[in-house]
Amino acid sequence: MKFENANVLITGGASGIGKIMGRMALEKGAKCFIIWDINQEGIDATKKELSKYGKVAGYVVDVSNNEVVNLAYKKTVEDCGNVDILINCAGVITSNKTFDQQTEAEIVRTININTIAPMFVTRAMLPDMLQRNCGHVCNITSAGGMLSNPRMSVYAASKWAAIGWSDSVRIELQNMKSKVHITTVAPYFISTGMFTGIKSPIIPILKPEYVAKRVIRAIERNTSFRGIPFGFHFIRFWQFILPTRIFDWFFGEVMGIYHAMDAFTGRK
């Protein structure tokens, strides 16, 4: 889908790759970059920084609260018009604890923001897109939703669920012959504050600009699924082909992925 003259709403758009994608959307001629974020200071700073590129609107929204989402969407449409492109980018990883040490609050927060929130936001906007028979929803998930990883079990579960939901909705729309498109993006670790302390000795940690460019390109091409880097498309193939102990040895010990969270600190 083209970004030119489109209203582009990005959850978590006040920082990280969300902010970068908003800038790129404006550079491609978007009518308005609409930020939904929990951080008012971040929204204000991003609006000031990106206003030279085009129109930027921002709203403080707890995307894990369905009532808040519906009210915010109504206000957004009143102020900015229909949303043409939705990018569900808000996400959280709470700690590097093993599952037995995870608190109820950490589990609930992770699932609410990473899994339930994009469902709430998409459900609020999808009916209008379907009525217009035009629109695009891009869900930023994670390679952690395809590859099991110790010390991030709840995060991995939240992203596995998000991938399954996102691609299932894609097929529903396909069966409806709708021109509304769904893109699921599953990037490896990104060098943002969210992943501070992550170690990856073999596979390079991704640069935010690199990821943002590939997400924008995937939306423009109506790509159904995009692993970043591309090699992650083949994870499930290798899981099917290799015995579990060989798969674990290669990805865990040789590639070092199973130890990536050992020194994780995250955003403070």
Q: What spans do the regions from the language model cover?
A:
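Conserved glycine-rich Rossmann-like NAD(P)H-binding loop of the short-chain dehydrogenase/reductase
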Residues: 30-45
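The beta1-alpha1 cofactor-binding region of Rossmann-like NAD(H)/NADP(H)-dependent oxidoreductases
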Residues: 40-41, 60-72, 104
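Substrate-binding pocket helix/loop in short-chain dehydrogenase/reductase
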Residues: 97-99, 103-108
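Active-site helix of classical SDR
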Residues: 122, 158
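C-terminal helical subdomain
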Residues: 184, 200-236
